[in-house]
Amino acid sequence: MLRRKKTKPMAAMTPEQQALIQRIQSLVTDQSDVREVSMFGGRAIMVNDKMIVSAGKAADLLVRVDADQHDALLSEPGAAQAEMGAGRRMGPGWITVSSEAIADDECLSFWVDAAMSYNKAVTRANQN
């Protein structure tokens, strides 16, 4: 008998979150393996089965970056150490960016590019 894996429906998105996801999707159209997943209380964009960013309900952005670049990227406007719940800091390589700091496409592109750089490095490492 064939068994199908049950998948939960994705959580509903806020209008702000949906708009941010559309903007992110437009920045990764050149990638062949892109999908959305509900993760970290938001909607994550996965490239090559690895999260690059997750859009929060308030249109803030959780970004996965190279841990070696973490401190330098924290100096960017609107960037903060990511937390999973009150006071539970995530490790190096996880940054939250405020919605105000990614209001224009150039700023959003900066963060998606940073995440894609890490994604490409990790994907290459896993292929070797």
Question: Model-found features: residue ranges?
Answer:
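Charge-dense, helix-prone N-terminal extensions
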Residues: M1-N128
